[in-house]
Amino acid sequence: MTVLPALPPLDDLETLNVHLETLSAENRVCWALERGPDHPALSSSFGAQSAVMLHLLTRFAPDIPVILVDTGYLFPETYRFADTLTERLKLNLKVYQPLRSGAWTEARHGRLWEQGIDGINQYNTLHKVEPMRRALEELQVGTWFTGLRRGQSSTRTQTSIVQQRDERYKISPIADWTDRDIWEYMKHHDLPYHPLWEQGYVSIGDIHTTRPLEPGMREEDTRFFGFKRECGIHENI
């Protein structure tokens, strides 16, 4: 059993984050499961390096709900990867989808992702943000685990290990991990990268707004035609 050090209370987030920076990712997870609000859950895109957080969380909470937002436009490889990891890690997978199908949305609005930044934002709200917000509410999630890392993009450099959003706490236990840390964890535990990783895809979302990394590109340029990096979930929830 992991013995956790005495840490500041949740209502002193600034001091708490300073202390959490000194702990391992494993101890951060244990702390959040023990001291955080009820009904923890993990969100996962089943993207390039998603196996790390899925493995890390289920080591300590085997039955934790794993939320996947299925936009209807994921890569076929992503659906198969989700099946593979769900079977291997015995995941308690909870799939949430938009209130309207992609075909219905296209009939109403056209291909929103081809309509500039405003269209992309509207698409993300309908197909990503709303389903995730609904999942968190229906599952009554008090402690929300994410795989956000500071090194992923310029929009994530200030990611705290714990944040408060209304009455919910958002926990990013590998916020300070580097790509090397990810690789070492995956190698040690024999975890797979997403099948598209070997084809140059370093950040994997929807099939129509994801590109492989090419010379001269930043990782964040591979999403949403370079307009933005975030899909809205971690900006708006």
Swiss-Prot record:
Query: Alphabetically, which GO biological process terms does the record hold?
Result: hydrogen sulfide biosynthetic process; sulfate assimilation, phosphoadenylyl sulfate reduction by phosphoadenylyl-sulfate reductase (thioredoxin)
Record organism: Xylella fastidiosa (strain 9a5c)
Provide the function of this protein: Catalyzes the formation of sulfite from phosphoadenosine 5'-phosphosulfate (PAPS) using thioredoxin as an electron donor.
Which classification does the entry list for the species? Bacteria, Pseudomonadati, Pseudomonadota, Gammaproteobacteria, Lysobacterales
Q: Please list every transmembrane segment annotated in the UniProt record, as residue ranges.
A: none
The record ties this protein, via InterPro entries, to: PAPS/APS_Rdtase, PAPS_reduct_dom, PAPS_reductase_CysH, Rossmann-like_a/b/a_fold
What does UniProt list as catalytic? 231
Query: What's in the keyword line of the UniProt record?
Result: Cytoplasm, Oxidoreductase
The entry lists its GO molecular-function terms as:
phosphoadenylyl-sulfate reductase (thioredoxin) activity
Entry's Gene Ontology cellular component terms: cytoplasm
Q: What is this protein called?
A: Phosphoadenosine 5'-phosphosulfate reductase
One of its Pfam families is PAPS_reduct
Family note: Belongs to the PAPS reductase family. CysH subfamily.
Its Enzyme Commission number(s) read 1.8.4.8
Q: Please give the SUPFAM superfamilies that the UniProt record associates with this protein.
A: Adenine nucleotide alpha hydrolases-like
Q: Which reaction does it catalyse?
A: [thioredoxin]-disulfide + sulfite + adenosine 3',5'-bisphosphate + 2 H(+) = [thioredoxin]-dithiol + 3'-phosphoadenylyl sulfate
Give the main location: cytoplasm
Q: In which pathway does it act?
A: Sulfur metabolism; hydrogen sulfide biosynthesis; sulfite from sulfate: step 3/3
Where does it reside? Cytoplasm
